Amino acid sequence: GIQVDEVLTIRDVDAKFGHVVFSGSIIISGNVCEGMHVSAGGCLTVAGLVESARLEVGGDLLVEKGIIGHPLNEQGGYSCTVHCTGAVAARFVQYADISAGGDITIASQSLHSRIQTPGSLTVADASRSKGSLVGGVSVVGQQILAVTIGAVADSSTQLVISGRYPELLAHRKEVRAQIEQSEIAIHQLDDAEAKVHQMPIGDKRQQLSHKIAATRSYLQYNLTSQQQEWETTNAERDAFLAQARILCARHLFPGVKVEIAGLKLVSDREYQTCQIHHQDGALVIEPLTALPPDNSSTHKPG
């Protein structure tokens, strides 16, 4: 049969209306006001502003206008927090803490915010002509695309792409150790086999030879599996490094701190259309010849 999700429609979420907790999807035609809490089990759409509020979303979040907060303390806390299982799309974000399970798309600007996603972050409109990423810390798993990154006389913009890289490195180390153990065991078996060949021909020698052959077959099977896992892990690492890029459509300002897969770089001057990526064990800033297409939803705020 057809499954119909429950949808709750509200005008404004303010002190008069109260906090909202709903298991289905929520459409708010107005604003989510200061100090309010909205929890949606499904998707959440806000036609207006989200101002110093707390949002928890089980699906995707769309904010037609902006998500705005203010700093709470010197430790970096913000008055506006968003935790979303799916993707997040908003026109602008300022002094907010946003974590999403899917991609995060901000149409015009992200200012002094903390952004986290295992996916990609895009700060750009559909035409890639505006979109400023200034200040704050953005930690993503795949790629960052913005029109302008950093600002004149600003050195507080931090961009980190880590994703699965630490996990892949740890697994690679583990597989390498397993391969070495298997190779040592096979070498020890060679020594044992040489000693058996020196024994007088008889039942005992034959028994030991059969046992060694069975053990060799088992060890060789393990070693082959481990070598295949090594190749797979290396391919996954290479694929991650190939797509872990920061793409800047117009201006990258000096003082932007970048970390990709554990390697660090600080932009030393202003760059025009460029990309930052991993190359031969270092991060490099190179000209960007083509931007990826805009594959985001047509519902993205413009």
Predicted regions and their residues:
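Charge-rich, low-hydrophobicity low-complexity segments
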Residues: G1-P118, T122-V123, S132-V137, G141, ...
